[in-house]
């Protein structure tokens, strides 16, 4: 039997390893759409802090881990699935047949419909490529605006603080981490963050982003 797993994040990797234990003779193909080996997105802030290198984000450290388990790997993006014929079409035109298919592709960042959101200096923080781009832009002393001060936002914020940037954080809610913290707790976090030199703006959003005259970008708040 042939198993294909679309997505080589933690869920896909554990699924492939579990399948191998349960079906020692089956064909298992693990598919990811990035050049890097399977890695943990949750480790990216620690990469930005400099606590680990890129290899430290990898889910399995041994280079031959998947080969020893006879789990094949492929880089590509599935563009169509024919459940009748049980085939997958990849973006390079290649078809791959399967007996069982697991879709473990996870989620992706939502870019709010803000004019200028697609300018080159505007980054999400989701992939290793994102981390490389942020590291190239977020040099000590550079001015950075972070949109969002939720749980994940605060983890990324800490990494940016350690990079020595001049950081402004904009949060639409009335406090930091609004979905998890009470007003009192949110205020405590804000005071601590401001002591680290971060400017925090709550009850505000971004109206538009423009190319700046004296800096690469100008951000207009609403």
Label every PLM stretch briefly.
Residues 3-4, 59-145, 218-222:
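FAD-binding core/adjacent interface of flavoenzyme oxidoreductases
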Residues 1-72, 158-184:
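Beta1-alpha1 glycine-rich phosphate/pyrophosphate-binding loop at the start
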């Amino acid at each position: 039997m042939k198993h294909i797993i679309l997505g080589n994040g933690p869920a896909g990797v554990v699924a492939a390893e579990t399948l191998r234990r349960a079906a020692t003779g089956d064909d298992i193909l693990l598919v990811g759409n990035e050049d890097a080996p399977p890695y943990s997105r949750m480790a990216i802030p620690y990469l930005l802090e400099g606590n680990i290198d890129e290899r430290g984000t990898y889910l399995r450290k041994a280079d031959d881990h998947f080969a020893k388990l006879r789990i094949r790997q492929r880089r590509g993006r599935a563009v169509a699935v024919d459940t009748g014929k049980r085939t997958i079409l990849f973006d390079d035109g290649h078809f791959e047949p399967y007996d069982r298919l697991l879709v473990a592709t996870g989620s992706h960042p939502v870019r709010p419909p803000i004019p200028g959101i697609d300018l080159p200096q505007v980054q999400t923080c989701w992939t290793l490529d994102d981390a490389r781009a942020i590291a190239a832009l977020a040099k000590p002393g550079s001015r950075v605006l972070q949109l969002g001060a939720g749980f994940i936002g605060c983890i990324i914020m800490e990494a940016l603080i350690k990079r020595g940037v001049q950081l402004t954080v904009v949060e639409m809610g009335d406090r930091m981490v609004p979905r998890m913290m009470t007003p009192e707790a949110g205020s405590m976090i804000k005071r601590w963050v401001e002591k680290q030199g971060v400017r925090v703006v709550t009850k505000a959003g971004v109206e538009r982003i423009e190319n700046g005259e004296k800096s690469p970008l100008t951000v207009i708040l609403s």
